[in-house]
Curated annotation (Swiss-Prot):
Organism of provenance: Methanocorpusculum labreanum (strain ATCC 43576 / DSM 4855 / Z)
Gene name, Swiss-Prot/TrEMBL: ribH
UniProt catalytic activity: (2S)-2-hydroxy-3-oxobutyl phosphate + 5-amino-6-(D-ribitylamino)uracil = 6,7-dimethyl-8-(1-D-ribityl)lumazine + phosphate + 2 H2O + H(+)
Enzyme Commission identifier(s): 2.5.1.78
Record keywords: Riboflavin biosynthesis, Transferase
Family in the record: Belongs to the DMRL synthase family.
CDD domains for this protein: Lumazine_synthase-I (cd09209)
Protein known as: 6,7-dimethyl-8-ribityllumazine synthase
Record: residues binding 5-amino-6-(D-ribitylamino)uracil: F22, A56, F57, E58, A80, V81, I82, F113
Gene3D superfamilies noted in UniProt: Lumazine/riboflavin synthase (3.40.50.960)
Gene Ontology cellular-component terms listed: cytosol; riboflavin synthase complex
Keyword Coiled coil on entry: no
Active site: H88 (proton donor)
Length: 155
């Protein structure tokens, strides 16, 4: 039986990051976590490029452009959607989630979901480096692992 399991070797990995400016107080912490993870796993600064977009809804388009460019082995998507008093939250969460998944499936490269979808600011803060860790860090580590699984599969 052959088992494919990702490792955290980051040799020659190029990473694109899409970060939403809306809720930048939270997203900047997610980005800091992602960059910390990449640095800890020896991804060179020159191998990371960041594109800022207005909000979470715009993430999938730029993730798709990055994936189509063939410059990156993985794309990390970072944002924070915090529930308000209208149904807008539900629409944004659904479309961002579907959009990011679609880009990954269409492009064949890992497009990591580091978009927080929380009921309140406290939950977002907890997931951006407080009690529950940093989901940006987790997305970056996941990106490295996924790149290595794909390399093992020979695709």
């Amino acid at each position: 039986m052959k088992v494919y399991e990702g490792n955290l070797v980051s040799k020659n990995i190029k990473i694109g990051i899409v970060a939403a400016r809306f809720n930048e107080f939270i997203v900047s912490k997610l980005l800091g976590g992602a960059l910390d993870a990449l640095k800890r796993h020896d991804v060179a600064d020159d191998d990371v490029e960041i594109a800022w977009v207005p909000g979470a809804f715009e993430i999938p388009l730029i993730a798709e452009k990055m994936a189509e460019s063939k410059k990156y082995d993985a794309v990390i998507c970072l944002g924070a959607v915090i529930r308000g008093s209208t149904s807008h939250y539900d629409y944004v969460c659904n479309e961002v989630t579907k959009g990011i998944a679609t880009v990954s499936l269409k492009s064949g490269i890992p497009v990591m979901f580091g978009v927080l979808t929380t009921d309140n600011l406290e939950q977002a803060i907890e997931r951006a480096g407080s009690k529950v860790g940093n989901k940006g860090f987790d997305a970056a580590v996941g990106a490295i692992e996924m790149v290595n699984v794909i390399r093992q599969l020979g695709n």
